[in-house]
Amino acid sequence: MKQNLHPKVNTVVFKDISCDFSFLGTSTLHSSETVKWEDGKEYPLIKVEISSASHPFFTGKQRVMDTEGRIDRFKKRYGKK
């Protein structure tokens, strides 16, 4: 069997940047940023744009989350001339 075939799984903190919500989980992602968690240990910080704390399906609230300017690009491209 090949050695070092699978990526290393680490405990990381995921932070939803749209609603400032953080949770601890496991992932194979790596990050140079770290954050001190509630247990006093430091974990790598992975920033995500959307999570269950901010997604309309889970929150029951509809809101526009145009973090990359997609609506403006669409209007510029296909808007009335």
UniProtKB/Swiss-Prot annotation:
GO BP of this protein: translation
InterPro entries, alphabetized: Ribosomal_bL28/bL31-like_sf, Ribosomal_bL31, Ribosomal_bL31_B, Ribosomal_bL31_sf
Pfam families, per the entry: Ribosomal_L31
Keyword Ribonucleoprotein among record annotations: yes
GO CC aspect terms: ribonucleoprotein complex; ribosome
Molecular function terms, GO-annotated: structural constituent of ribosome
Keywords, sorted A to Z: Ribonucleoprotein, Ribosomal protein
SUPFAM superfamilies registered for this protein in UniProt: L28p-like (SSF143800)
Keyword Ribonucleoprotein assigned: yes
Subunit structure of this chain's protein: Part of the 50S ribosomal subunit.
Family of the protein in this entry: Belongs to the bacterial ribosomal protein bL31 family. Type B subfamily.
HAMAP family in alphabetical order: Ribosomal_bL31_2
The protein's name in its UniProt record: Large ribosomal subunit protein bL31B
Native source organism of the sequence: Bdellovibrio bacteriovorus (strain ATCC 15356 / DSM 50701 / NCIMB 9529 / HD100)
Lineage summary: Bacteria, Pseudomonadati, Bdellovibrionota, Bdellovibrionia, Bdellovibrionales
